[in-house]
């Protein structure tokens, strides 16, 4: 698992916290994407870092654990056969997405945080 460590200092206590955030595995063709709109039936339209708009499928294990909404930062994996479709691998929370944006790890095309 490729990850990045984020250090944030607590001004009052003087303590530092580390967050471990997964990054897309480029060798497995994963990439960042922003959820654009929900289509129903556990599918949504996403805007990828390469500028393409793809139909993304929310897998059952993610559908039961956490809700994906429009505007969320995601890691997706395009299908091998149909490149215009993809699977959602991971959803970042708002604080995690802003931490990636502060560290300049998001591509310019989707850095809206």
Protein language model regions, located:
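Short, structured beta-strand/loop micro-motifs enriched in basic residues and often containing a Trp
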Residues: 50-60
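Short, charged beta-turn/beta-strand-edge "cap" motif at the junction between a beta-strand
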Residues: 77-84, 94
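Short nucleic-acid-contacting surface segments enriched for D/E, G, S/T with interspersed K/R
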Residues: 62-75
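Short aromatic-glycine-enriched beta-strand elements
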Residues: 41-46
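A generic structural motif
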Residues: 38-39, 92
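Short peripheral tails and domain-boundary helices/loops at the edges of structured domains
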Residues: 91-113
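Short boundary/loop segments of OB/S1/cold-shock single-stranded nucleic-acid-binding domains
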Residues: 2-31
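Conserved hydrophobic positions within beta-strands
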Residues: 34-35, 88
């Amino acid at each position: 698992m490729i990850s990045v460590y984020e250090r944030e200092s607590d001004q009052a206590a003087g303590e530092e916290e580390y967050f471990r955030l997964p990054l897309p595995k480029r060798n497995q063709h994963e990439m960042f994407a922003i959820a654009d709109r929900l289509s129903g039936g556990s599918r949504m339209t996403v805007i990828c870092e390469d500028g393409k708009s793809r139909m993304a499928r929310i897998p059952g294990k993610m559908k039961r654990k956490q809700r994906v909404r429009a505007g969320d930062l995601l890691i997706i994996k395009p299908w091998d056969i149909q490149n215009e479709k993809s699977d959602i691998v991971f959803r970042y929370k708002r604080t995690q997405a802003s931490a990636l944006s502060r560290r300049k790890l998001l591509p310019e095309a989707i850095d809206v945080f």
